[in-house]
Amino acid sequence: PVGLGSDISGGPVSSVWETARLALVAARLRASGTDPDLAPEARSHHPGDRVDAVTAFWLATAGGADALGLDVGRFRPGQRLDAILVVPGDDTSAIAPWPGEDEAPARRLERLVHGTSRADIADVFVDGRRVSGARR
């Protein structure tokens, strides 16, 4: 199993959202190549390594749980609930929907992965209990 970790010893940030964003950037660099002396089509030997936001989110949740053998990371009956409630902090939040915009679920998740910040986290739940939140 493969997952993303967000503890400080495993990376530079503790945010699961930032970890997912860094995975997107790293995968894009690997897929696109980084040698400026080569033409874009000749830069990469790994074009299939690109990761989308849905995959990055899965790696940061269910993938991480699977890699560690933990019974979390999914909304299923009988499974422990470790979750965060994400609500746009205000109208200027990067995750606030545009007026009249009707987004597909994958697009909404992409917006969350790319834009969620601490100010957007309303509540944190560990094992089903509310433990904290940026706006508590």
Regions found by a protein language model. Give the residues of each.
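His/Asp/Glu-enriched, well-ordered alpha-helical/loop segment
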Residues: 1-92
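C-terminal cap of metal-dependent C-N hydrolases
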Residues: 80-135
